[in-house]
């Protein structure tokens, strides 16, 4: 029995060592080999044999040879025990076998390592056993049937063991990269042979090898993904930065374009200022003519609501026409946040002036409508009369002066009604009432008119008998214009700028004599707005007190003026806040002497104007427009001369008979009532030749080719005569 147990233990030990090494082998060959080895051991241990031993035995051995075979196996097992101990797969199993042998009493300890085998030796032995033609049972019986192994066989066994482990690792790696279960599913024989109980250390190492590769692969993949994301993020940031830069450049281009466009627009507006003023005055005259053509009954049938609506419509039309001049003010103001306060005041002043201008034009239109009717209806009662100087009495203490003021105040209150006024309780007067009140408005007898003013109470009572004022509830304290004489068809001056002593009644009523520009009415409008702000209308004021307030306002506005004749816009002691057509004509005549005037020169020669930034800018723009027309004509005629075949500048000359001179004189001296100085002809000739030389030399291809010509012409200005410093210079020049 002990021999039988030892044989079985040796068989199990051999099988386990083969499995731990991991050698692949076929089931049939291995089974046959183990069956033969088992039969051999059983026959050696049991001489008598048995039926079971006979079944597994293939070759019968002699009784004398059985102990030799067993001795050889034990000897070889003892010699290989030390050689197999370094292998990791044999450590645990060898210790288990030693423990098992110790438990059995230490008998036959040499069997613990007798099951050593390897892939190369077993396969080689199986091939030799199957292919050999020899009948020797020693060679086919078992792997231990050979004589003692040499050192070369031991080294070869170690190399084969290492190659087997390397092949196993490569197989595991290939399985992990493709399909981890392919090898196990495809090799069922190996799975059947491999035991279920594998050592814990081997299992841990296999798991570690299987886990290392996917973790490294996953980390590399994550690094690749993160690098890709970082690259995309960087590209996105660069694109965003480029987009922001392009947006900044676009905004800069837009700002430059708007600046150029605004400057061009402002120049075009300045070129058309004079024509706009002329068209505006013609429009007002046309409206006045249409209104004059209406019948008296139609005017009498207007109720207060319709009258106010019509007046407000006129105001809106005038404000629409003034939009462009209003826009020029804010362009100069929006230069910086630090200069908001003073330029904001300037903007408010300009806006107030423009609104007052529109208001004054509406008042003029309404006054002309109502003042033209008496001249048509009563020509035989009111013949053409001379305007005496007595009507310009000291401090305005004149009956007709106050009647005119009363008349103007009535129409002013119609345009801007007092919120306290009511029209529901008092009806408008009829045609008969207006006919009775007309003598109080326009009647004047020069032969009986005293030079001194009547008592205050006498004319106050007569003033407030006006049906349009008293019946409609208009307050006299809302005095609109302290100087309404030009609005009453009695202009201060002639077209030449001198005060006129007499005008026929027909001329007085004509639209031309009533045409007032924006500049001449700005002073009166500003003064009236001052009265409206500081002296609001109050129904509690009695008529006498209201009239006295009006007189005091006139005196306060006049200041130290002792005579009403000094209110003339072109008198030396009165200051204007606006520019008139006479100022424009004066500037055109000054252009014959100076093309580039300074602001100080303008203040010296326009002493009757109260200068501010707007006035100075307007005058400078006038001269800029003059120069532009001048240079355009010079370039035009220079090119025309080149086309005509002129080759030398000596052939170019300007005389008073040439076409270029006539064009310039028609623009700057339209009435041809001023003798152009000879110096201007010389300057014009030099300018023409400069343009001719520049065009011949091909300098006109440069956008700034005219700047060189400008530098030459600006040095040719001459002294302006002293007579231009006088406010009445136009009259004096024409009389000379």
From Swiss-Prot:
One of its GO terms (molecular function) is DNA-binding transcription factor activity, RNA polymerase II-specific. A motif (Nuclear localization signal) lies at residues 163-168. Residues 264-274 have a biased composition (Acidic residues). One of its GO terms (biological process) is olfactory placode formation. Residues 103-146, 180-220, 261-301, 319-344, 445-465, 499-518 are annotated as: Disordered. GO terms for cellular component: cytoplasm; nucleus. Residues 576-734 are annotated as: Homeo-Prospero. Residues 576-634 form the Prospero-type homeo domain. Its main location: nucleus. Belongs to the Prospero homeodomain family. Transcription factor which may be involved in developmental processes such as cell fate determination, gene transcriptional regulation and progenitor cell regulation in a number of organs. May be essential in the development and function of the eye. May play a role in the regulation of the circadian rhythm by repressing the expression of clock genes. The Prospero-type homeodomain and the adjacent Prospero domain act as a single structural unit, the Homeo-Prospero domain. PANTHER family: HOMEOBOX PROTEIN PROSPERO/PROX-1/CEH-26, PROSPERO HOMEOBOX PROTEIN 1. This is Prospero homeobox protein 1. It comes from Gallus gallus (Chicken). The lineage of its organism: Eukaryota, Metazoa, Chordata, Craniata, Vertebrata. The gene is PROX1.
């Amino acid at each position: 029995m002990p021999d039988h147990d030892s044989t079985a233990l040796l068989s199990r030990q051999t099988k386990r060592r083969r499995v731990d090494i991991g050698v692949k082998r076929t089931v049939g060959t291995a089974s046959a080999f183990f069956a033969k080895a088992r039969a051999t051991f059983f026959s050696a241990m049991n001489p008598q044999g048995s039926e079971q031993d006979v079944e597994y035995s293939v070759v019968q051995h002699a009784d004398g040879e059985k102990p030799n075979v067993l001795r050889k196996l034990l000897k070889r097992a003892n010699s290989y025990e030390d050689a197999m101990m370094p292998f990791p797969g044999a450590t645990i199993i060898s210790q288990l076998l030693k423990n098992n042998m110790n438990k059995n009493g230490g008998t036959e300890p040499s069997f613990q390592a007798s099951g050593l085998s390897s892939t190369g030796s077993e396969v080689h032995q199986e091939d030799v056993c199957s292919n050999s033609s020899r009948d020797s049972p020693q060679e086919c019986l078992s792997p231990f049937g050979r004589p003692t192994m040499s050192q070369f066989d031991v080294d070869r066994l170690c190399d084969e063991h290492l190659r087997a482990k390397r092949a196993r690792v490569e197989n595991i790696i290939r399985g992990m990269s493709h399909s981890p279960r392919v090898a196990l599913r495809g090799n069922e024989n190996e799975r059947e042979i491999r035991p279920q109980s594998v050592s814990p250390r081997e299992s841990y190492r296999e798991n570690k090898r299987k886990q290392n590769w996917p973790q490294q692969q996953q980390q590399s993949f994550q690094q690749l993904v993160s690098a890709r994301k970082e690259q995309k993020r960087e590209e996105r940031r660069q694109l965003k930065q480029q987009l922001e830069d392009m947006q900044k450049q676009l905004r800069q281009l837009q700002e430059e374009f708007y600046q150029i466009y605004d400057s061009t627009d402002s120049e075009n507006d300045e070129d058309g200022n004079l024509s706009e003023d002329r068209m505006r005055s013609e429009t007002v005259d046309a409206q006045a003519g249409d209104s004059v053509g209406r019948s008296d009954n139609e005017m009498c049938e207007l109720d207060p609501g319709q009258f106010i609506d019509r007046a407000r419509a006129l105001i809106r039309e005038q404000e629409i026409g003034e939009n462009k001049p209003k826009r020029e003010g804010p362009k100069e103001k929006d230069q910086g946040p630090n200069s908001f306060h003073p330029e904001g005041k300037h903007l408010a002043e300009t806006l107030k002036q423009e609104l007052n201008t529109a208001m004054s034009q509406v008042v003029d239109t309404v006054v002309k409508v109502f003042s033209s009717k008496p001249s048509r209806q009563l020509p035989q009662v009111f013949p053409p009369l001379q305007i005496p100087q007595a009507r310009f009495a000291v401090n305005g203490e004149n009956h007709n002066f106050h009647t005119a003021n009363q008349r103007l105040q009535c129409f002013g209150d119609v345009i801007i009604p007092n919120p306290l006024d009511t029209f529901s309780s008092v009806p408008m007067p009829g045609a008969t009432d207006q006919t009775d009140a007309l003598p109080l408005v326009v009647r004047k007898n020069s032969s009986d008119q005293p030079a001194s003013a009547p008592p205050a109470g006498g004319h106050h009572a007569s003033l407030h008998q006006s049906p349009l004022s008293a019946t409609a509830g208009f307050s006299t304290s809302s005095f609109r214009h302290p100087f309404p004489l030009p609005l009453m068809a009695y202009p201060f001056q002639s077209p030449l700028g001198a005060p006129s002593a007499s005008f026929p009644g027909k001329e007085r009523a004509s639209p031309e004599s009533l045409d007032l520009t924006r500049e001449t009415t700005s002073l009166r409008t500003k003064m009236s707005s001052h009265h409206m702000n500081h002296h609001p209308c109050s129904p509690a004021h009695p008529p006498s007190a209201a009239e006295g307030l009006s007189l005091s306002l006139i005196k306060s506005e006049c200041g130290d003026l002792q005579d009403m004749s000094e209110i003339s816009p072109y008198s030396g002691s009165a200051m204007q806040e606006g520019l008139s057509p006479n100022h424009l004509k004066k500037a055109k005549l000054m252009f014959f002497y100076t093309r580039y005037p300074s602001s100080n020169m303008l203040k010296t020669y326009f002493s009757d104007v109260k200068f501010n930034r707007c006035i100075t800018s307007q005058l400078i723009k006038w001269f800029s427009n003059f120069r532009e027309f001048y240079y355009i004509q010079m370039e035009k005629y220079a090119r025309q001369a080149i086309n005509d075949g002129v080759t030398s500048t000596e052939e170019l000359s300007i005389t008073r008979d040439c076409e270029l001179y006539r064009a310039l004189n028609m623009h700057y001296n339209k009435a041809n009532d001023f003798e152009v100085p000879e110096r201007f002809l010389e300057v014009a000739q030099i300018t023409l030749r400069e343009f001719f030389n520049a065009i011949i030399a091909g300098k006109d291809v440069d956008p700034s080719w005219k700047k060189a010509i400008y530098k030459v012409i600006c040095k040719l200005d001459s002294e302006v005569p002293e007579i231009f410093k006088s406010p009445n210079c136009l009259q004096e020049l024409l009389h000379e």
